[in-house]
Design a protein with these regions (language model features):
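Extracytoplasmic/lumenal ectodomains and periplasmic regions of secretory and membrane proteins
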Residues: 138-189
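Short S/T/G/P-rich N-terminal loop/turn motif that feeds into the first structured element of a domain
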Residues: 2-146, 191-223
Length: 223
């Protein structure tokens, strides 16, 4: 047993890392009513135009109260405004909507990762027509759904993690830059088929690394 002490310790460390990642990325806890009320109360202070915020609160509360404790994949369909909307929080910003969005994302990314969320897909619309008859779609040409600019899908380990991000004071500090720069359709989705899952990919990587190290050490012993 002493001969394989290093391998046993390494396997224990890797297993602990995998179990931690699995728990962190899949907590499985449902929101309580008290937690929902707390998040909604904090969300009511968000720097979003009042009429839009009121509608958003209704949808957010209903979704939070229907929590199933499972991870959620948040679809962001984004379309830039021709120019920044006039909001007091971004009055001093000198830049385009694209630059304002990049500024927001630069500061929000650490908060997102801290909450356990991470992007699984980001892509720009290719566009099919340009000029005055511009279009991003091959089907469905209603102006309400056409001419999008990009799609982003973010995985959250739980609805609680999403609300932790959304109500974080630092996140709210930069939210006006996103509100002023683009129209976002935010749609929560289930992950019926996602390849690969990050925690299992990590587990596979750790297993391969462990076997490689054990093999190298075995060769050295035999030499």
């Amino acid at each position: 047993m002493h001969r394989f002490r290093f391998e046993v310790i390494l396997a224990t460390v890797f297993l602990a890392a995998f179990l931690f990642a699995n728990h962190y990325l899949n907590p499985g806890n449902k929101l309580t009513q008290a937690e929902v009320d707390n998040y909604i109360s904090r969300l009511e202070q968000a720097p979003v135009p009042k009429a839009e915020l009121a509608q958003m609160i209704v949808h957010m509360r209903a979704w939070a109260e229907a929590d199933d404790g499972k991870p959620v994949y948040m679809l962001n369909l984004m379309r830039y405004y021709p120019q920044l909307l006039t909001l007091p929080e971004v009055a001093g910003f000198q830049g385009s909507p694209v630059e304002a969005t990049a500024y927001d994302e630069e500061h929000v990314a650490p908060i997102l990762f801290g909450a356990g969320g991470y992007p699984v897909f980001l892509g720009a619309m290719q566009g099919t027509l340009q000029g005055t008859a511009s279009s991003s779609n091959l089907m469905a040409f209603d102006p309400a759904v056409d001419n999008g600019n990009s799609v982003l899908i973010i995985r959250y380990p739980s609805r609680s993690a999403f609300f932790e991000l959304l109500t974080d004071p630092q996140y709210l500090k930069y939210l006006p830059y996103k509100v002023a720069s683009l129209l976002v359709a935010l749609s929560p989705m289930t992950g019926d088929l996602i390849l690969p899952r990050l925690d299992w990919a990590l587990g596979a990587g750790l297993l391969i690394l462990f076997l490689a190290i054990a093999w190298i050490r075995a060769l050295r012993r035999a030499a």
